[in-house]
Amino acid sequence: MTQVIIDGDACPVTNSIIELTKGTGIFVTVVRSFSHFSTVIQPEHVNIIYVDDGPDAVDYRIVKLVHSDDLVVTQDYGLASLLLNKAKIVMHHKGFIYNQENINTLLEQRHASAQFRKSGGRTKGPAAFTEEDVSKFESIFSNLIHKYFLETED
């Protein structure tokens, strides 16, 4: 069973993913901490899993859930690195695909920024997520699910 697993605590494209997978046979699993609890009723193809509010509780649950034919959306580079050999595709909500070539650079940049902040330096946060970013993600995501999950062999 193909599913899209979303690291859902801070994912700005959750609604886009749910909308783009409607009627495709692809299931969506959103993993969130209880601090992000919602009573919004979701479509039948969507499953919301709530976990404790611990620092990596969502990540641990995602690692347990993922299968080799899944697509995972996360902005967490550490989680992405753990999933590269488990999931079919691991992508960021900005639309880029994590792979063995870029993950080490991303982790090194994250570490260098953390060290700089620890020594008293200040770093800029991420740029605001725009409608253009949403459109870019939707285009890339749609192409991926059609290429890897919806095309059938004749």
Swiss-Prot record:
For this UniProt entry, which residues form the secretion signal?
A: none
Q: Which Pfam families match?
A: DUF188
Similarity comment: family membership: Belongs to the UPF0178 family.
Write the protein's name.
UPF0178 protein SSP2038
Tell me the superkingdom of the source: Bacteria
